[in-house]
Regions:
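Short alpha-helical Gxxx[C/S/T] motif in the catalytic ATP-binding
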Residues: 180, 184
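Conserved catalytic submotifs in the C-terminal HATPase_c
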Residues: 91-102
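Short helix N-cap motif at coil->helix boundaries in the Bergerat
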Residues: 74, 156-164
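Histidine phosphotransfer helical core of two-component systems
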Residues: 12-49
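Conserved micro-motifs of the catalytic ATP-binding
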Residues: 64-67, 102-105, 172
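A conserved beta-strand-to-alpha-helix junction within the catalytic ATP-binding
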Residues: 68-82
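Conserved glycine-rich
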Residues: 192-193
Length: 214
């Protein structure tokens, strides 16, 4: 609620202020009135769009449906994901322990998680001389635990930031919405799984998701 209130107030306050100013100037009809009006309207339009985008992202978080589980092969799941990143300048490496491993998942939701993680990893290492992302799977039979990790050789995440990245609407990207990793965490939680991150500044990050195989 605090985050929601803060974001809405940040958008509404300048809109109200500018509206008041434009009304006053319209009455006074001072110099450079046309430029002032245009600048004010542009700001109102931009902040209104920002507020609309925020509300839409909030809806995505609050309306995430319960997963519809169905058996999916790991190889099949990753095969479709691979196609989306074929044209990337980043070198994506896939180390799949068992392509025939079956998972009971909501395929659409899990694809959303993987796309988000691979996209973020690619962006994180894009500026490296040899940008590389490794996707690796493993299965711990005695505990029925399936793991999938996404590791990049990017710049890593700052220590004071790493604990906040799963918080809704928290982002360090200028154009980021801050909901991607929050959605990932929610989806994994709804699947009875988890997601964690380990990162070393200057060396890269590793996101690991864990699912119980039933």
């Amino acid at each position: 609620v605090r985050v929601l209130t803060h974001e809405i107030m940040n958008s509404i306050t300048p809109i109200i202020s500018l509206s008041d100013t434009l009304c006053e100037r319209a009455i006074q009809q001072g110099m450079d009135e046309e430029n002032l009006m245009l600048q004010g309207l542009e700001t109102i339009h931009r902040r209104s769009n920002g507020l609309m985008n925020f509300v839409e992202n909030y809806r995505k978080l609050s309306r995430l449906s319960s997963p519809v589980l169905a058996p999916v092969r790991v190889g099949e799941l990753l095969g479709d994901i691979k196609k989306l990143f074929l044209s990337s300048k980043v070198h994506y490496i896939y180390k799949v322990e068992d392509e025939n491993q079956m998972l009971m998942i909501d395929r659409s939701q899990m694809e959303q998680v993987l796309i988000n993680l691979l996209k973020n990893a690619g962006e994180a290492c894009m500026e490296q001389e040899n940008p590389e992302v490794v996707v690796e799977t493993s299965y711990q039979a005695e505990k029925h635990i399936f793991r999938l990790s996404v590791t990049d050789n990017g710049c890593g995440i700052l220590p004071n930031v790493v604990d906040k990245i799963f918080i809704p609407f928290f982002t360090t990207k200028p154009t980021g919405s801050g909901i991607g990793l929050s959605l990932c965490k929610q989806i994994l939680t709804l699947h009875g799984g988890s997601i964690r991150v380990s990162s070393e500044e200057g060396k890269g990050s590793c996101f690991t998701l864990k699912l119980v195989v039933k």
